[in-house]
């Protein structure tokens, strides 16, 4: 399986979630199963079945996170030279040429993307158009509303 890029911050967030699932949620669920089992007949024990379902979800998420972390290529933006190029992990401010509105995005891995936090996946159309470009370059992005032209007005290598 190929490696997937991820920022240091993204990897840390996944590790924190994995730790919580293994050492907080897992013991709590095991205790809930034991408590429900003590109530007697398991066939009609809704608490038991709910706890087992929760356990199944928790274990599945643990496996998913372990797989993501094992296939992650963690990129530390602070160790890369700031040469003004847009790369994975950089924070880019762009200006919509037609309207003059400015947008700022951080280019991150697929699991880290969150448009509410202005984090976009490196595989998104905007990020694909920006990566490799430099300050003052113009890029054209295909959007559902048609082709949109942006100008890169700032490139930062910010570590959160």
Curated annotation (Swiss-Prot):
Gene3D superfamilies: Transcription elongation factor, GreA/GreB, C-terminal domain, Transcription elongation factor, GreA/GreB, N-terminal domain. It comes from the Bacteria. Residues 50-70 form a coiled coil. Signal peptide: none annotated. InterPro entries: GreA/GreB_C_sf (IPR036953), TF_GreA/GreB_CS (IPR018151), Tscrpt_elong_fac_GreA (IPR006359), Tscrpt_elong_fac_GreA/B (IPR028624), Tscrpt_elong_fac_GreA/B_C (IPR001437), Tscrpt_elong_fac_GreA/B_fam (IPR023459), Tscrpt_elong_fac_GreA/B_N (IPR022691), Tscrpt_elong_fac_GreA/B_N_sf (IPR036805). The keyword Transcription applies. Belongs to the GreA/GreB family. GO terms for biological process: DNA-templated transcription elongation; regulation of DNA-templated transcription elongation. HAMAP family: GreA_GreB (MF_00105). GO terms for molecular function: DNA binding; RNA polymerase binding. This is Transcription elongation factor GreA. Necessary for efficient RNA polymerase transcription elongation past template-encoded arresting sites. The arresting sites in DNA have the property of trapping a certain fraction of elongating RNA polymerases that pass through, resulting in locked ternary complexes. Cleavage of the nascent transcript by cleavage factors such as GreA or GreB allows the resumption of elongation from the new 3'terminus. GreA releases sequences of 2 to 3 nucleotides. Keywords: Coiled coil, DNA-binding, Transcription, Transcription regulation.
């Amino acid at each position: 399986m190929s490696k997937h890029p991820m920022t240091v911050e993204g990897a840390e967030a996944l590790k924190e979630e994995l730790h919580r699932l293994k050492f907080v949620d897992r013991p709590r669920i095991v205790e809930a199963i034991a408590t429900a089992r003590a109530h007697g007949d398991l066939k009609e024990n809704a608490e038991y079945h709910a706890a087992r379902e929760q356990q199944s979800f928790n274990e599945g998420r643990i496996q998913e996170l372990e797989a993501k972390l094992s296939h992650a290529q963690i990129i530390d933006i602070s160790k890369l030279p700031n040469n003004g190029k847009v790369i994975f992990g950089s924070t880019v401010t762009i200006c919509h040429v037609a309207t003059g509105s400015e947008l700022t995005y951080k280019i991150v891995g697929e699991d880290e993307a969150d448009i509410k936090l202005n984090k976009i996946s490196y595989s998104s159309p905007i990020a694909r158009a920006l990566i490799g470009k430099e300050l003052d370059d113009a890029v054209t992005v295909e959007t559902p509303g048609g082709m949109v032209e942006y100008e890169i007005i700032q490139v930062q290598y910010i570590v959160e």
